[in-house]
Amino acid sequence: MADWARAQSPGAVEEILDRENKRMADNLASKVTRLKSLALDIDKDAEDQNRYLDGMDSDFTSMTGLLTGSVKRFSTMARSGRDNRKLLCGMAVGLIVAFFILSYFLSRART
């Protein structure tokens, strides 16, 4: 950068400044290329994540429908009378026991 101060003729100063300008333009072009590549990578990643989130949204929507139906059936069964309350309690205890047994076997399978 200080080479232009040592130049003897005005033509040499212009040549040195021109070379420095080209070098800086090349550096700028390489930085712009890297930024463009980075922006494209971010865009691709954002699109992938949006697709993933859309898939999760449809999964949660279907799960919500399934759980809503189960809760309605469970509520109907709970309101149906005293005879079914023993059955309901037995089913609840059975589901809890099944959950703990399943979690025990899954934890043993991982270790």
Curated annotation (Swiss-Prot):
The keyword DNA-binding does not apply. Residues 1-86 are cytoplasmic. One of its GO terms (cellular component) is Golgi membrane. Keywords: Coiled coil, Golgi apparatus, Membrane, Phosphoprotein, Protein transport, Transmembrane, Transmembrane helix, Transport. Residues 108-111 are lumenal. The keyword Transmembrane helix applies. It comes from the Eukaryota. Residues 15-77 form the t-SNARE coiled-coil homology domain. Vesicle SNARE required for targeting and fusion of retrograde transport vesicles with the Golgi complex. Required for the integrity of the Golgi complex. Component of a SNARE complex consisting of STX5, YKT6, GOSR1 and BET1L. Interacts with STX5. This is BET1-like protein. It comes from Pongo abelii (Sumatran orangutan).
